[in-house]
Amino acid sequence: LNDDKKRKAFIERVGEMTLKLRNCAKPVIGMINGVTAGAGVNLMLACDIVCSSEDAKFIQSFVNVGLVPDCGGMYLLKETVGLQKAKELMFTADVISAQEAEKLKMVMHVYTKEDLKIETEKIAQKIAQGAPMAIMYMKKMLNKSYANLKDFLDEEALVQTFCLGTEDCKEGILAFKQKRQPNFQGK
């Protein structure tokens, strides 16, 4: 990448991966096993739920090569761990363990290497049992920034009004009354 236009185009394409993860209508579950560095950490932060093995390690390594984090890493890390901790992790390039990443809420669940895939799949299966449209709207609203609570409540009212008219809502209410699992169809 020997000119600014090419470098900028490359970085923009890399950033698009983050947006695709964040804007995907379905939940994205990250499963981390081993060392995750740089852009890998930032793409992980764009996932909705992250599970890792107990021996996983994470590093914001950009400063070691004279770069700032890409893939929205500064935004996502600050959003996840707070401003000061994000600065510390980026400025120092300290390696953090899976256990520390879990404490910082970068990772939601830590499992043994042997259980990682099975347990992550259990989470995915549990989510898949939910109403697809409701989950899609929850993800969309949780990922969106609102100026204030009133703006959020206005959008919530629109989305909830729509959801109340869906076949999934009718099925969910009927299943609740009949004390059975709902069979959602995404309608």
Regions found by a protein language model. Name each.
Residues 151-154:
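Juxtamembrane helix-entry segments on the extracytoplasmic side of multipass membrane proteins
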Residues 1-20, 36, 66, 147-148:
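Glycine- (often His-adjacent) and acidic-residue-rich active-site loop
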Residues 19-133, 157, 161-166, 170-174, ...:
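Crotonase-fold acyl-CoA enzyme core
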Residues 181-187:
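Short C-terminal tail/terminal secondary-structure segment
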Residues 1, 77, 184:
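Short clusters of hydrophobic/aromatic residues that line enzyme substrate/ligand-binding pockets
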